[in-house]
Amino acid sequence: MAALEGPLLLPPSASLTTSPQTTCYQATWESQLEIFCCLATNSHLQAELTLEGLDKMMQPEPTFFACRAIRRLLLGERLHPFIHQEGTLLGKVGRRYSGEGLIIDGGGVFTRGQIDTDNYLPAVGSWELTDDCDKPCEFRELRSLYLPALLTCTICYKAMFRIVCRYLEFWEFEQCFHAFLAVLPHSLQPTIYQNYFALLESLKHLSFSIMPPASPDAQLHFLKFNISSFMATWGWHGELVSLRRAIAHNVERLPTVLKNLSKQSKHQDVKVNGRDLVGFQLALNQLVSRLHVKIQRKDPGPKPYRVVVSTPDCTYYLVYPGTPAIYRLVMCMAVADCIGHSCSGLHPCANFLGTHETPRLLAATLSRIRYAPKDRRAAMKGNLQACFQRYAATDARTLGSSTVSDMLEPTKHVSLENFKITIFNTNMVINTKISCHVPNTLQKTILNIPRLTNNFVIRKYSVKEPSFTISVFFSDNMCQGTAININISGDMLHFLFAMGTLKCFLPIRHIFPVSIANWNSTLDLHGLENQYMVRMGRKNVFWTTNFPSVVSSKDGLNVSWFKAATATISKVYGQPLVEQIRHELAPILTDQHARIDGNKNRIFSLLEHRNRSQIQTLHKRFLECLVECCSFLRLDVACIRRAAARGLFDFSKKIISHTKSKHECAVLGYKKCNLIPKIYARNKKTRLDELGRNANFISFVATTGHRFAALKPQIVRHAIRKLGLHWRHRTAASNEQTPPADPRVRCVRPLV
């Protein structure tokens, strides 16, 4: 069995009319495109069965072709009974028919005669001047256009109206309809009106959304999927377990409430009884900052997406943001039993449209047809990558690992003009909140405190291992949340260790996400021999009166320079910290008067990199003297760097004492006096870091080596000449601490 090729104009014959279909479940979009192309252009769709292929076929005369398709759609679908003499043509099978019909022979010639058959040729009525007809135009009669695509499906008038709106505006559609209605005989006008309203069937059921109306079950599953997807963006913190469980339980148990809330207008308040919603919202505010909702006790006025929470004590007002629109719905489902309307039926104000809004929305829909973008395949592909990037920028779960490592990275390495610098994290000031367990005993705990002001520190703890301090602030309900302030230094593992230790002496149930309030870093310039350059002769610095440092301020950030070329930087970390240091050190290291010893810079930067700690006073002095002695004796200074690379001068941060012990502890050895500021020598106390922890050989040589009166001036003279500072021979054994007259050799004086 084979189908008759088409589209083909059938000769006038008896036919049966069919009712227009607005819902065709078996009709595919490709078949509707093929039918429309045949109605408009009298030819098959040569290209792909897509909108782009249809555009190519309609390109010569889109308005004329679209109007011809409208006229044929208004005449409707028809069925012509036929018989094929050879019995090989395929047709639609229907009821038995006896009467005049079409007889088709083996050569495809049509004749009319009496037939008895149940086969029909599907066609569409046509009243066109362009039809291939032997009669003059004034003697036109209704013809039929046979379409092979109608053998497997029917015409879906909703789909046809969507395709028509692609090529015509609505006023053009109306003009085409009325012009065609004026030339038709009165006998065809009822059919025309019936098919006209079938085309406009989609305008009877208006919707705010772009998506077509879904079935109730599909809409309920769609809401559940959106709720689950939205909750998945919150992260998986233990404090949100009860909130997730309450939402999931109520969504499955109370689907009617879910439907009511989804249909509720954004300008209508949701009334809730009880304070559970306030507790859930406080926890979510702490954990997901992008979803923060302000909880107010004063009425904020008429605002969209408002929730009114009534408690025995007072009334709370929560105004949810419009994006995402499902936010208020999800939070209200957590307390679905406490919502102040009936759970059995729809809410009285849960309808989308009022009676007076239908004409306005219909006019807006017709106006939107005029300016709507065409649904071409290229335009239908959204840029999902850009959407994901915008979402990822605000989602706490997608915080990049590189950002976390920058925040908790203990060291940063910078190379500027082949000068190596290591930046150390001194400490971080971290703010967060904790929720505590309810005490089960009558003993005094952290929770048994009187009512105080909110900014009052009620407890302060200092931990030795791992080293950090914590301050606990007052809170009205410490079981729900209290603020803590942590001062700590170290990497991510050190921080997690500290948080675990914190749970050993505080009744902590959950720790909320932390935020770094301040960040302090420090660095030493190793190898810069004239260290006074960082604090003298500069116009962009100012001295502080209450601290012995000079502050350089650039781009709103301060760099404090202490003696011996040591600097501290606050409020910045990661790559911005590196850029700030580059801008700060570039004028110093590139100055023509700067004297830099590359060997010392490589040795000390290597030790800092190996030991992950700043070089202490005794280490610094010992290695400075060792380097100068090797240089004075014409020995290879590079051997010291090779020895440092093999670990000969390594030290550990753990051997540094954490307390300022008395001077008696200092005589026990290096292990005890490394960071102790004073030692007991020659019946007096002497500060080790009086000249600065990073003081170089030129700075501290005047205060040491008193027993080598003959050798010391020679080594000092050699060091000054090596640096090109034009040493004047004024230093003798008797007055070796007297500063030179030449201002260019001020570096031999101790820097204060």
From Swiss-Prot:
InterPro entries: Herpes_UL87_C (IPR004285). It comes from the Viruses. Pfam families: Herpes_UL87. Changing residue 328 to A: Marked defects in late gene expression. Belongs to the herpesviridae UL87 family. Interacts with ORF34. Plays a role in the expression of late viral mRNAs together with ORF34. This is Protein ORF24. It comes from Human herpesvirus 8 type P (isolate GK18).
